[in-house]
Amino acid sequence: MTTRELNIYMNQSIERLIKNTLKATFANPQATAFVLKMQKVIVEAQKKRENYETSGTHIPAFLISSITDNCNLFCSGCYARSNGICGTSKSTGENLSVMQWKQIFTDAVEMGISFNLLAGGEPLLRKDVIFAAADVKNMIFPVFTNGTLLQGEYLDIFVNNRNLIPVLSLEGEQNETDKRRGNGVYDKIMLVMKQLNAKKLFFGTSVTVTTENRQTVTSTSFLETLQKSGCKLVIYVEYVPIEKDTAYLALTNKDCEELDQAIDILRKQYESTIFLSFPGDEKYMGGCLAAGRGFFHISPGGNAEACPFSPYSDRNLTQVSLLEAIQSPFFEKLRSSGLVDGEHTGGCTLFEKEDDVKNLLL
């Protein structure tokens, strides 16, 4: 798939996402009005990306920004802690300042990047950056949060800035969630969902899928709980065993196939809910979308990385512009080597080919 073909496919995928979001927010006039407004913004963003494509630079539609290396939870098997993104001696140093993040957000809008996924660590620990994102009205910021800090002033921030979309992390029902995230976390998240729903906010949940919880998180019981809580977006993320002794939790090829089948059934069963699967949906887009094909990752310290699960970089946003980061020779090597745009059979491609990835930096 050429970059131009990928651009067309990504644009079509985003259009379907917007259409599905309109369906999901049909009973919520405020949310629907926001989606209709953003629909026009996204069309303008597509034109900007097409202009760059014509001049020889492929601009991804998405960014993933880990805005802090701090977190208030210690979740079992956390990729951010294992990769040094979050609260360890391997962290890259100081986090980017709010002014540096503002510049990144502004530059991203100018280049036509439509979505910026804010992660961490726990992103709500960087209130200054969240406020900065709220001011960037021409971009949608899904905020991937553990949910435990989403109360009081933060509720008001999300109410007043619809471009910030809370995405709360769950591992399944109470037993699965509290086992990985800590006692009492599930109840806190359920309370937050109730409050978000009362405020008529569009929000979602992110579910890390393992061999232990796969059947639970695709069950009717789990989905009914989310429906009653007002959740309209479910993002399934296949577990990546960054910690070697957790390899047994990673989905097999058969598990991935069964997960895909289960999600297809859920999409038909719950038409007013949006279901996304990562990296499962990538196989329909000619391979892994990392390294700037569809997205890239910015670490808390500013490293431009192909993917959160592959924390290797040759450029840092404290030294280069966002455009220069996108034009990274390392990213180009990843794409031209076939590591990201080859056949995608499921699972995290770059994590599985870690040695090949590191060799490209030599």
Residue ranges, per PLM feature:
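A short linear boundary/processing microfeature
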Residues: 81-84, 164, 183, 328
